[in-house]
Amino acid sequence: MKKILFTFISSVLLFSNSVFSMTLWTTETQPGRMQIQEELIARFTAKTGIEVKLVPQEEDELIEKASAAFAANSLPDVIFNAACVNFCAWAYDEGVFDSDAATEIVNSLGIDTYSAKGVLSMSEVEPGVYASVPSGAWPNATYYRMSYYNDNGLATPTNYANILAGAKALHNPPNRYGAIVPTDVAAGFMSQWMETFAIANGLHPVKEDGSINFDQKKTIEMLETYKALVGMSPEGIHHWQNGRDFYASDVVPLTFWASYLLDDIAGTRDNVPIMVDDNPQSLALAQDTNVIVGMAGPSNPDGGTWVEVHNFGVTVDANTDEAAAFIEYVMNEEYVTWLGMAPEGSFPIRPGPSAGSNIFIDEWGNLPIGVDRKIPINQIYSAEIIESLINGLAVGTRWGAKEGQLPVAAKLVNSGLMNRLMMEYINGDRSAEE
C-alpha cells in the first residue's frame, strides 16, 4: 500500500503542469558527498519531476542559519543533519520542525522496519510523535585485539570488570600499555566518552523536570573505573588522535573510539600506518580486532552506549508533500546510496524496506570504506562483527533523550564540567564523593 501511495503521489507530481521545487539543506558538505547527493537528486527529479535545490550548511552554523531563516519565513523544505541529536531537539523546541509531517513519514516507512528502536525513540518527542525522521546512526565502541585476549585467556571486554581485568593483565609499560582513554578536558572527544561510560553504568543525571542529579553510587563506580584506565594509559594528555595512533602502532591492545575508526585501522590511510607487521597498509590489525557496541557497568548489566543520529527534518515552511516524497525516496530506493557517503559513520537503522528484510544491511556491508584506499566493509570485518555493530545500536542513547531534556543535557556536556571534575579526581584534587 505504501509503495502504491508513493507511486501515485510521484505520478501526480510528475505529470502536473506546475513546476515543483524544494530546497534541501545538508551538512554533508564534502565535495565527494555533495556529488553523491547531486546525482541522487537528479535521479529523484527524473522520476518525480520535483526539482531539488541542494544547499550545503556547516554543522556548527546550522542553528544560527535556521534561526535566521525561521524569523524570515524562509526555511528550506528539508534539513538533513548528520549530527542531529541536539540540533533536532532544538529545532523541535523552537518550532522549526513540523512533527506532524515527520510522524507521517515515520509511520509510512513503518515503525516495524526500524531495528534500532532506541535510536528511533530519540526522535520521539511525545508517545507516537516524532520531531524528525532518523536515517542512520554511528556509535561509540570498544576496540580490542582478539589475539592478545584469547592468548591470555581474557574475557571479552563488554563490561567494567572485564575491561579493567584485561587492561591490567596486558599492561606492561613501556612496551605495551593496558588501554587508552581520552584525558583532554577541552576536547569534545573526552566529553563523549565520559557520557559513554556514564550511560554504560545507567548514570543519567538529567531528570524529566530538567534538574541535574548525579546518583552517587553509579557516579563513583564510573569515576573509579575511568581513573583506573587512565592509570594504565600511556603518559600524557590524550585525545582522539592518540586513541587511534597508539592502537594502530601496537602500543595499546584496547581503545575506545567512534565507529569512524573502522577504516583507519584497516590500512586505508597513509597518515595512519599499521605497525603490527611489516606492511603499513596491512589488514592484519583490523582482522585481529573485535568491535563491541555497548558497555555495561555494575549498576546497569544491560549496558548502553553513546550514539549520534542522522535525521531528516521537515520544516514548518515546507511543501510537505514534496518533502515526504523526497525523504521516502531516499529511505527506500536510495537508502544505501545515502549511507554510502560515509558508511563507517552511517549505520543502517532500517534493515530493509519491510519487516523481516535485511537487504539494507547486506548492501551496507558491500560499501567501500577508507580514505587513500577503499575496501568493502565485509572484506575487512566478519559477518558476526558487522551484525554486532548493527545490533549494538539497540542500546544507543544520550543523556536527556529518554527524559525529553536533550537541550539541558547538551548544556551540561558542552560545559566540560564532567571532564574537569574527572581530572581533578584523577589528580587527587577532589574525592569521588565530592
Language model region names:
Residues 83-139, 164, 190, 278-295, ...:
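Hinge/lid segment of periplasmic solute-binding proteins
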Residues 22-38, 405-410:
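Extracytoplasmic "Venus flytrap"
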Residues 20-30, 50-55, 78, 131, ...:
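Short, well-ordered beta-strand elements
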Residues 39, 43-115, 147, 151-158, ...:
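Extracytoplasmic "Venus flytrap"/periplasmic binding protein-like
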Residues 265-266, 283, 298-417:
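C-terminal lobe and pocket-closing loops
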Residues 167-169, 208-237, 280-295:
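Glycine-centered hinge/linker elements that transmit conformational signals in sensory
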Residues 7-16:
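Bacterial N-terminal signal peptides
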